[in-house]
């Protein structure tokens, strides 16, 4: 068997917590409960109320009803003891929940017959934890002897003075001295409690240590095999259906947000003179659309305002571009035509721009950009000259060069 030298992983600790194997400093919890009870006893346990009940019964002079007598004493006991018990229970439950990180050990509730195994019982009897408990018991005996010695030296006069105390103060003085004795014992036992918690923490992690094979196996179970993980990543990257891919390839251009919205615009004047939305995706699918368009050579125009406007005004795929966005789409189409013409060294193709009659099908809107299209290439321009505004719809390209098909169109 391989030596367990690796620290327990987070998953190992979570699984152990579900089985009830958590770090438990029981003595610290006991210290908190005892200290809480000692400090709360003088305020919650009032012996004068008990004495007053005796006085009330004796002053009546009549034989009390046994049922009513028992009920009165039970009610008085609950009034005195219930707040004290509830406070001590809360003081013990809260540290226990904090130590277990508020994890409910559901599996530890089941009946386990292996706990009755005598072999495992012998192993627990001669384990490191049993040796620790034996040493701790001897230390507590020494702490108790030290506590009695210190208490006798400090409060022996008060203890012997109880013989001369008035009966009305006798109960209160006993409670005060008992509380002082308990707090003094806890103070003397504090080093032992801290040492016990440190050793318990060490033994807890020692029992949950893992060998290297267990760590690798757990990593494979949680993260998956490297080949399987790579295949899963490839499958997750297939965000686009074949239909959307075909729509991207047939689009005239893609206008992007640039990372959260991708809108495909398709124009075919022979069928419909108005552009319509062929692709409409957001977030991860928008990035996939942009990557696929760049791979297929479809122009990608990064124009935040236009992309948001089309996305807002055209709520569905295969719907026409709204009246408010016609001008922006036309500018992009004219710009792309000029870019293609500049790259080929010829005039821009007429199929990239709507004819003068086509925009009239959209509420009589005049074709935007006609002046730019008419003046893009003067008659006396040399062959291969780029359009004056080939860089963008509003200005020339930097350094006089022809811009690429994928550009930035932040209006």
Swiss-Prot record:
UniProt-annotated stretches for the region Disordered: 341-411
Residue ranges, compositional bias (Low complexity): 370-404
Domain of life: Bacteria
Membrane topology reported for the UniProt record: Multi-pass membrane protein
GO biological process entries: protein secretion
Keywords, in A-Z order: Cell membrane, Membrane, Transmembrane, Transmembrane helix, Virulence
Alphabetical list of SUPFAM superfamilies matching this protein: EscU C-terminal domain-like
Residues annotated as transmembrane: 28-48, 80-100, 137-157, 175-195
Alphabetized Gene3D superfamilies for the sequence: 6.10.250.2080, secretion proteins EscU
Compartments where located: Cell membrane
GO cellular component, one term: plasma membrane
UniProt record similarity statement: Belongs to the type III secretion exporter family.
Summary of the function given for this chain in its UniProt record: Part of the bsa type III secretion system, is involved in the intracellular replication of invading bacteria inside the host cell. Probably necessary for the lysis of the vacuole membrane and escape into the host cell cytoplasm.
Protein name: Secretion apparatus protein BsaZ
Gene that encodes it: bsaZ
